[in-house]
Design a protein with these regions (language model features):
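C-terminal motif of bacterial Sec signal peptides marking the signal peptidase cleavage site
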Residues: 26-29
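Acidic, low-complexity, intrinsically disordered peripheral segments
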Residues: 31-82, 346, 355-377, 423-429, ...
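A glycine-/polar-enriched beta->alpha junction
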Residues: 35, 132-142, 148-163, 191-221, ...
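Regulatory alphaC helix of protein kinase catalytic domains
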Residues: 71, 82-132, 136
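Small/polar, glycine/serine/threonine/aspartate-rich low-complexity segments that form flexible
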Residues: 112-122, 169-233, 363-376, 404-405, ...
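Amphipathic alpha-helical coiled-coil scaffold segments and their short linker/junction regions
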Residues: 133, 195, 315, 319-324, ...
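Amphipathic alpha-helical coiled-coil segments
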Residues: 143, 147-157, 267-294, 301-303, ...
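Hydrophobic, small-residue-rich alpha-helical packing segments that form membrane-like cores
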Residues: 172, 186, 226, 230-239, ...
Length: 594
């Protein structure tokens, strides 16, 4: 391929200076280039969200969040040996506390002090939890970045199909012995080109090459030389790699961005449902603690009354032991409930991205979602039409079908058409400037064919993609079946929760009637009767509270599994037409009545 450059020493110096300036400009434009990439990434994300519809949102890339990196980093000497801190057992210390015998009263006082609420705790509502998670949750940020990476991969693939400019400047020094003295020369070569991939395979390119040589020894004659050349080339496949299969990487990258948009939107729905479940569980645990505290108080009252009966000789002494035992069991259960609640709060804070050492107070929230009318046939139809994961699973079958076509195309022979044209300056003129001589125009057209004598690897890939296609079809049908099971389970879950609520309401009423009957005739009831009645009332109240929580979650699960859940950009549930969404908040939701 012809090369050309600048002729005289001044031109060589100018070319060298131009190359240095170009390098500096390239380094200085890195930041602006990254800003352009961020803008284009956001544009792709916006278009994918708009294509998805349904009020979908998209994250916006923020370059300030990421490590900028260094062009020439200086690493520490031990960079290949990261330090590990793992001291032997002899360097560690274990300090045991002395065993102290405590009675029930001292245990109660110490436990109440340990579980006392922090007055400086930050109140956390469900809405504020959602808002905090959207900004700080590692899980949510990872989902956003997964979406961003799909857009970046599309940009990278689209860039491969855009005109790609290149410019290479090289400066060389050459010395050659002439018998009595050395001849020294300085040469500068600049190659400016652009290439473009063709939509149906192959590529075209154009390059402008200049070459200049400056003789540094002018003791006899100056042998300075300069030439230019313009080269146009096209390489077009006619069999393997020809046609629409050439665009498969670009097609797949664009489809992958659509899949990423669906996955992110489905993640937002799942995230809302799971956070709602976590929060309602915390509220349920708070109510369970209130129920446990009430049982401890009632058990202590039964214990005091039984002691009085024993002291008056109206009952056997072992009845007092039974009452004491029940109080201790109630205290132990309350201790376990409080510890389980603290553990749940720490896990909830961790999921929100909040430091676990921060003190928070959960503000009780109760959803007031209307019970939907469930028609199983219609629900399944909605799920098959609207569920984003099913749509992606269906479209993956098309992806694997195209991969089979690409693999089949790769089994063909290579038949390529090469066209090249080289226009250069007059080689008989030492310094030709930027002028071309049509008399020195070279044109080449060549057709080459490579027979497919060895296509074993390609045949294996074809069979592999055919198997993967069948697996994707089965995967789609399995996903449909799994979705149908989930929809049916969600519909039955609503009915199950309604039934459980009705049963537990009657159970609570029966337990309270039992307790009232014992209170009306205390002398006829033993300590066992009283403690059994308290346990039954606590279990009934806990079961009723759990049924209420399960009903609200069952409604949310039904909306999500049928593809009808919609979430605002702020992370809140969007009511469907005909659906009224209400929330009750505040400490008054926790029943602390004696």
């Amino acid at each position: 391929m012809p090369r050309s450059t600048v002729p005289t020493d001044s031109r060589c110096a100018a070319a060298t200076l131009w190359a240095a300036l170009a390098a500096c400009t390239l380094l200085a434009s890195c930041d602006s280039g990254m800003q352009r990439i961020d803008r284009e990434t956001n544009d792709r994300l916006r278009s994918s969200a708009e294509q998805l519809g349904g009020g979908s949102i998209y994250p916006e890339i923020d370059g300030n969040r990421y490590e900028s990196g260094s062009n020439f980093p200086k690493y520490p000497e031990d960079v290949s040996r990261p330090p590990t801190e793992n001291p032997p057992a002899t360097a560690l210390r274990f300090e045991a506390i002395p065993t102290v015998k405590e009675d029930a009263a001292s245990i109660t006082r110490r436990f109440e002090k340990m579980s006392a609420n922090d007055p400086a705790a930050k109140t956390l509502t469900f809405d504020s939890s959602i808002a905090y998670a959207l900004e700080h949750s590692e899980e949510y940020l990872t989902a956003e970045e997964t979406y961003l990476l799909s857009a970046i991969r599309l940009l990278a693939e689209e860039h491969r199909w855009a005109p790609l400019p290149t410019n290479t400047t090289s400066v060389g020094y050459e010395t050659a012995g002439g018998g009595t003295r050395y001849n020294n020369a300085l040469s500068v070569i600049n190659d400016l080109g652009v290439s473009q991939r063709l939509p149906y395979g192959g590529d075209v390119s154009a390059s402008f090459v200049t070459r200049g040589t400056k003789q540094l020894d002018d003791y006899l004659n100056s042998n300075d030389a300069q030439s230019v050349g313009l080269v146009l080339e096209a390489n077009i496949p006619l069999l393997r790699g020809a046609g629409e299969v050439a665009q498969e990487p670009l097609i797949q990258a664009r489809r992958d961005l659509v899949y990423a948009a669906r996955n992110f939107e489905q993640f937002r729905r799942d995230f809302y449902y799971e956070l709602a479940g976590d929060y309602l569980l915390l509220v349920l645990q708070l109510q369970g603690i209130a129920n446990g505290e009430r049982q401890v108080e009632r058990s202590a009252s039964v214990e005091a009354r039984t002691r009085a009966l024993v002291e008056s000789g109206r009952t056997e002494p072992f009845q007092a032991d039974l009452a004491i035992q029940n109080t201790l069991f109630a205290l132990d259960r309350l201790s376990s409930q409080r510890e389980a609640y603290r553990l749940s709060v720490d896990r909830f804070k961790s999921r929100l991205g909040m430091p676990v050492e921060d003190s928070v107070a959960i503000d009780p929230t109760q959803f007031k979602l209307p019970v939907p009318k469930v028609d199983m046939r219609e629900s399944l139809d909605l799920a098959f039409r609207f569920r984003l994961d099913l749509q992606t699973q269906r479209d993956l079958v098309d992806d694997y079908t195209r991969r089979v076509d690409v693999a089949r195309n790769n089994t063909l022979g290579d038949l390529n058409l090469l066209i090249a044209n080289s226009l250069r300056s007059d080689p008989t003129v030492d310094v030709a400037g930027v002028s071309f001589d049509p008399g020195y125009d070279d044109f080449t057209a060549r057709l080459s064919y490579s027979m497919p004598l060895d296509r074993v690897q390609e045949d294996l890939r074809l069979r592999q993609t055919q198997i993967l296609l069948e697996q994707s079809k089965r995967g789609y049908f399995q996903a449909r079946d799994a979705a149908a099971v989930q929809v049916r389970q969600a519909g039955r879950g609503i009915e199950r929760s309604l039934f459980s609520m009705a049963v537990q309401e009657k159970n609570v009423a029966a337990s309270m009637n039992r307790q009232a009957a014992i209170d009306a005739a205390p002398d006829r009831a033993t300590a066992r009767d009283r403690t059994d009645a308290l346990d039954a009332l606590r279990r009934a109240q806990d079961s009723l509270d759990n049924a209420k929580k399960d009903l609200q979650l069952a409604i949310l699960r039904y909306l999500n599994t049928t593809g009808q859940m919609r979430i605002t950009p702020e992370g809140q549930l969007i009511p469907l037409p005909g659906m009224t969404v209400q929330e009750e908040t505040g400490p008054g939701l926790i029943d602390t009545s004696p």
